[in-house]
From Swiss-Prot:
The lineage of its organism: Bacteria, Bacillati, Bacillota, Bacilli, Bacillales. It comes from Staphylococcus aureus (strain JH9). Its main location: cytoplasm. Belongs to the class-II aminoacyl-tRNA synthetase family. HAMAP family: Ala_tRNA_synth_B. This is Alanine--tRNA ligase.
Length: 876
């Protein structure tokens, strides 16, 4: 067998199947496009669902790809096994109703055994089949010539995910020899068993049945092939290494971890787990961020945060106690660059995101682990179970993923009360991770729309009306010839001015009518074969196929949509100009009444940045730039500097919307003819939607004017209430009122101090001597959290050589502050005092050696915390 680099295996696989007439499907982004059923692209076939279920027809029925994928259903196993990964590449060849078992098996055998390709020894290959799949057996035995002893029948060789396409599969195994598979006596030492000697290298699925709702099986009208070969696994076989982690996909990362940690890989089993966790997770995190995902508290963002925090925790077992994961990004980029240049192109941005997350987690990790260790001690002394409410508080307050708590608990021989935890999560849905369901990689084939191949031409770029013919009616999932008034119907037209929802732009609405009927059009989408599919309600009359009709788009809405879409392009360019090239579109919505634009950026925009962006967009509007729209090949578009939206896939011919020199972008939407038609642009809000993603909402034209008119009306009302005449006097009056408020608050604060002092009496009498230190530990009655600081300042001025610790209860929230004379900070640190006290009142805190503060949510435990800290000082 040839010893090949992973990149060579990938390229050979693609080249082989191109020779066999396959079309290369580029690897899609890990964040699914137009597929809400998937959290991540999790297999090679996931991006091809549209072909298998009939929504789209591929240019060629033979497809090959190398698809990056993420699976996170067994994160806790990663690091502890030889082949578990959260990120992996799946090589696959697919047939959509073209070839079937004979060719699929012959292709696989040729690729694996031919000296031109992998050069595997035929006598080291075994296969498994379904017991009833005699066709596969005969191909392997009679046509390929595989001995019967190397064909194993296994009942589980049937691919079935429930309702939808299903069928038998055959798996191919490579015998690595007696040197492998002796580590565990429990290993099932045969092809198809759990062992390290006979490794599965390829799975061929023969999709030939439809699993119906009643659990019966019927033959599919189109039989399909879906295969999968894990690149990491095949690399381990080709390079003859024990695990995937010793391949050239991982070893450069391992070498860098060795340099940072000073530890060696493959010397200590426990440390090896940490090496594997870090190496796997950094690949996942780097690729996910490069494809548009960002750490967050829910959904796919939570997965990233969980992976990063898990890797950080394991890095501590290697003695790494500072942010370092971001330093591995360049290594990942170099390894994967030949096929995935995107990671290298976005490396700086990826590193900034990771470093920011690492720094945030390191801030809370120490406190969180300290609390968890206390919970473990408590559980070991009682029920051997960590209380679910405590686990939830750890998650909610300290950002500790529950999976991390569970993993640490298991290592300590404990379990977590997940029932109570889930109950707490349910009560705080806004903080919960987004619920997910395992998605199916294919759907039941819909033949109705797939079989409609007649052309439908979109003419809406040039007109909002058309005389046309109604060609197809779909009612209740079936194609019909007529539909009555009051019914909801789907239909197609030979020519249509209605834009189908796409690229963030909403669909047109309007009417389709003649003298006999009228349909109010509410939605327009794309059918599998590319036609615009209209949805509407029959207002009156009887609709018949073949009718000549007038199609009219709501022109007022269309004009507003055009303005907002062109303004979105100008906004995108302005954001890049003001904030930097790291800005990428993360989502958009273009409607008639507003536009919304999501983009990648750290932190809120300043008012000055918002003003700059707004001014830039309006300047381009007022310049009256002609909007030049052309169709051209993708290479020409890139050459002229057209910006492609990140994550989008484009065909050979693209549409370029040119507002040069300010904005040139690929887009299929509807736009104004000149930027002056937009009239006016006004940003109404800038907010965050998740870590690293900001959102701008804006108005154009008349809507922007009405918004400004409303603001002016409110300003005039405020001017009247302030009893001033000119606009300039408003600011002066406001400043005057603020100064008066500050003076009154200062008087009130002084009065509160005097009242507190009267209540406390002579504070010198309350000072205790503990372990040789003068200490004042007390609860104070103050009106607000801010007042405890001023009280501390007052006490500190009177007791300059005293350790002072104050706590207060304001509105059922605990505030605490500690101060230590600088002469004592070598022995006693204020930050340590607060860190010890805060968990007792259900909170956290910290600070400098001489001054620290904290808070909590359990005022009933204030006395307990004050007693505790006295004992703590006593034992220093």
């Amino acid at each position: 067998m040839k010893k090949l680099k992973a990149s060579e295996i990938r390229q050979k696989y693609l080249d082989f199947f191109v020779e066999k007439g396959h079309m290369v499907e580029p690897s899609a982004p890990l964040v699914p496009i137009d597929d809400d059923t998937l959290l991540w692209i999790n297999s090679g076939v996931a991006t091809l669902k549209k072909y298998f279920d009939g929504r789209e027809t591929p240019k060629k029925p033979r497809i090959v790809n190398s698809q990056k994928a993420i699976r996170t259903n067994d994160i806790e196993n990663v690091g502890f096994t030889a082949r578990h990964h959260t990120f992996f590449e799946m090589l696959g060849n697919f047939s959509i109703g073209d070839y079937f078992k004979q060719e699929a098996i012959e292709f696989a055998w040729e690729f694996l055994t031919s000296d031109k390709w992998m050069g595997m020894e035929p006598d080291k290959l075994y296969v498994t089949i379904h017991p009833e799949d005699m066709e596969a057996y005969n191909i392997w035995h009679k046509d390929i010539g595989l001995e019967e002893s190397r064909i194993i029948r296994i009942e589980g060789n049937f691919w079935d995910i429930g309702e939808g396409p299903s069928g038998p599969n055959t798996e191919i195994f490579y015998d690595r020899g007696e040197a492998y598979g002796q580590d565990d006596p429990a290993e099932e030492m045969y092809p198809g068993g759990e062992n390290e000697r006979y490794l599965e290298v390829w799975n061929l699925v023969f999709s030939e049945f439809n699993h119906n709702k009643d659990h019966s099986y019927t033959p599919l009208p189109n039989k399909n092939i879906d295969t999968g070969m894990g690149l990491e696994r095949m690399a381990s076989v080709s390079q003859n290494v024990r695990t995937n982690y010793e391949t050239d996909l991982f070893m450069p990362i391992m070498n860098e971890i060795e340099k940072v940690s000073g530890k060696q890989y493959l010397v200590n089993n426990e440390q090896d787990v940490a090496f594997k966790v870090i190496a796997d997770h950094i690949r996942t995190i780097a690729f996910a961020i490069s494809d548009g995902a960002l750490p967050a508290n829910e959904g796919r963002g939570y997965v990233l945060r969980r992976l990063l925090r898990r890797a950080v925790r394991f890095s501590q077992t290697l003695g790494i106690n500072e942010p370092f994961m971001y330093k591995l990004v360049d290594i990942v980029a170099d390894i994967m660059e030949p096929y995935y240049p995107n990671v290298k192109e976005k490396a700086d941005f990826i590193k900034r995101v990771i470093k920011s997350e690492e720094e945030r987690f390191h801030e809370t990790l120490e406190d969180g682990l300290a609390i968890l260790n206390e919970l473990i001690k408590k559980a070991k002394a009682t029920t051997n179970e960590i209380n679910g409410k405590d686990a939830f508080k750890l998650y909610d307050t300290y950002g500790f993923p529950i999976e991390l708590t569970e993993e640490i608990a298991v290592q300590a021989g404990l379990k977590v009360d997940m029932t109570t935890f889930e109950s707490e999560m349910q009560q705080q849905r806004d903080r919960a991770r987004q619920a997910r369901q395992n998605s199916q990689s294919m759907q039941v084939q819909s033949e109705v729309l797939k079989n409609i191949t007649s052309a439908s031409t979109f003419v809406g770029y040039d007109t909002a009306t058309a005389q046309t013919t109604l060609t197809h009616l779909i009612y209740n999932g079936e194609e019909v010839s007529q539909v009555e008034a009051g019914e909801t119907v789907y239909f197609m037209l030979t020519e249509t001015p209605f834009y189908a929802v796409s690229g963030g732009q909403v669909a047109d609405t309007g009417i389709v009518y003649n003298d006999n009927f009228e349909i109010a059009v509410s939605e327009v989408t794309k059918a599998p074969n590319g036609q615009n599919l209209h949805k509407g309600v029959v207002q009156f009359g009887q609709v018949n196929v073949g009718a000549t009709v007038s199609a009219e788009v709501n022109q007022n809405d269309r004009r507003d949509i055009q303005k907002n879409h062109s303004a979105t392009h100008l906004l995108h360019a302005a954001l890049k100009s003001v904030l930097g090239d790291h800005v990428n579109q993360a989502g958009s919505l273009v409607e008639a009444d507003r536009l919304r634009f999501d983009f990648s950026h750290f932190g809120p925009m300043t008012n000055d940045e918002i003003d700059q962006v707004e001014r830039l967009v309006n300047e381009e509007i007022w310049k009256g730039i002609d909007v030049n729209i052309q169709e051209m090949d993708i290479a020409s578009a890139k050459e002229m500097g057209a910006m492609a939206l990140f994550g989008e896939k484009y065909g050979d011919v693209v549409r370029v919307v040119n507002m040069a020199p300010f904005s040139i972008e690929l887009c299929g939407g509807i736009h104004v003819r000149n930027t002056s038609e937009i009239g006016l642009f006004k940003i109404v809000s800038e907010s965050g939607t998740g870590a690293g993603v900001r959102r701008i909402e804006a108005l154009t034209g008349k809507a922007a004017f009405l918004y400004l008119e409303d603001i002016q009306e409110k300003f005039n009302t405020m001017k009247s209430q302030m009893k001033v005449k000119s606009d300039d006097q408003v600011v002066e009056k406001l400043t005057q009122l603020q100064d008066e408020e500050k003076a009154l608050l200062k008087q009130l604060e002084q009065r509160d101090k005097e009242i507190t002092s009267l209540k406390m009496g002579n504070i010198e009498d309350q000072v205790e001597e503990i372990n040789g230190y003068k200490v004042l530990v007390t609860e104070v009655d103050v009106p607000n959290a801010k007042a405890i600081r001023s009280t501390m300042d007052d006490f500190k001025s009177k007791l300059q050589d005293t350790i002072i610790i104050l706590a207060s209860n304001v509105d059922d929230k605990v505030s605490m502050v500690a101060t230590v004379p600088k002469s004592l900070t070598n022995n006693v640190k204020a930050g340590d005092l607060i860190k010890q006290m805060a968990p007792i009142v259900g909170g956290k805190g910290g600070g400098r050696p001489d001054m620290a503060q904290g808070g909590g949510t359990q005022p009933e435990n204030i006395s307990k915390s004050l007693s505790f800290i006295k004992d703590y000082i006593k034992n220093l």
